[in-house]
Amino acid sequence: MRFVDRCRLKVIAGDGGNGAIAFRREKYIPFGGPAGGDGGRGGDVVFVGDGGLSTLLDFTYARTLEADRGEHGMGSDCHGRAGADRVEKLPVGTQIFDAESGELLADVTEHGQRVIVARGGKGGRGNLHFKSPHDRAPRRAEPGEPGEARELRLELKVLADVGLLGFPNAGKSTFVAAVSAARPKIGDYPFTTLTPILGMVEIGGGVRAGGSSFVIADIPGLVPGASEGVGLGIQFLRHVERTRALLHLVTLDPGEGREPLADYRALRKELKKFSPEIAERPEIVVLTKADLTEVRDAYPKLKARFAKAKVKLHLISAATGEGVPELVRELAALARKREEPAEQDG
């Protein structure tokens, strides 16, 4: 399925039905009073968060979402039926903006969260409402009110506890596959991962077994200049915004001119350009591919160089599992630590 994380569309709520002009027509009552019913209310356009969705692809095909109008009122004081709501599911993590003003209308962060983005118009009143001592047979009724219409911009930002960063081919996809049930595409060429990949990491059997879990997001490969649109560009840097902690993978690859500390500094620079606040979040820095002899031999010197830069460098191998359990526990602790203040504030 193609990953789409932003789109624009129009939403049109239903118009209210018109009130009716009608009179009682009963035997022996030749001049019955007013009996016009009210028009029905127009339907709303509603978005509902769905944790099972991961793309806005469907909205690239349906550029206009329209709810039903209310039925008109009828005689015998019969009211029109309300128009049906137009209900559409959205991926959890979607932000809804007014396309013209740029105002954030809603942030869909929970499964089942409902957001009314366009309200249906009220139904008009029938002539029964206009009867008075001075006018016992009113011949007027109200038209229904128009439903709201607006242009929206939808932006999806993945919801994850830990954001996984690193140059292309730093081993991010291999790590996600090793610690979760996610199966990202893995290859030996740049930008193997072209969309954010979410993986659920379970500890001690997961929540159901009395353990814990957290979500990790493999953000597509960042390169110098990403904050200005180079490579896959800023389109995916946005997905780091909701993470609580960062896991930064570096690798030793002299054949491609990769130097771990230089790579780390380059991507830290991009993060700071994009968002100084995100750059200050807790992070763990890891040298991958410990199963390779050249990596293991170089680790002591690299660790010392990172230490001079006041950065602790871990060593793991996603292929053999070396260092992975300890790293997962440390990430889980970071995710919990960041979550606790938010819960206390709430």
Swiss-Prot record:
Localisation per UniProt entry: Cytoplasm
Binding site for GTP: 166-173, 191-195, 218-221, 288-291, 317-319
Cofactor(s) it depends on: Mg(2+)
This enzyme's EC code(s): 3.6.5.-
GO-annotated molecular function: GTP binding; GTPase activity; magnesium ion binding
Ranges where the OBG-type G domain occurs: 160-336
Protein name (Swiss-Prot/TrEMBL): GTPase Obg
Organism: Sorangium cellulosum (strain So ce56) (Polyangium cellulosum (strain So ce56))
Phylogenetic classification of the source organism: Bacteria, Pseudomonadati, Myxococcota, Polyangia, Polyangiales
Gene transcribed to yield this protein: obg
